[in-house]
Amino acid sequence: MPNQPGPLSDPIHIEQLEISTHIGVPDEERLRLQRLTLGITFWPYHGARDLEDRIENTINYSAVAEAATNFVRDQSVNLIETLADGLATHLLGSFAIQKIEIELRKFALPDAKYASITVTRTASVN
């Protein structure tokens, strides 16, 4: 099954993947682990009808979650915008994904539930 761009397939979604990492602008914020959650929606090159009920014909969402967790934990950035953009680029390059949307939430504001960024990226066609 070659990875050719075409109509978007059926999306796969990972909701509220929880990760702790060092992120933030003030030094005191970066000293302690910050709780983040990720919502990751991705569109494989092949839809559910094409999978023949075989895991090797799709993208294993457990592998995506593990790659996202490892990437976030290995980063040292200040901004959630930078982290979300880097993660989207990393996952597009690591898996046969034609489009990805990531919502990254950070729980750092005392009077708000969270602050978040949503990025949407599409694989480049070579």
Task: Annotate each PLM feature.
Residues 1-126:
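N-terminal, polar/charged subdomain of small-to-medium soluble alpha/beta proteins
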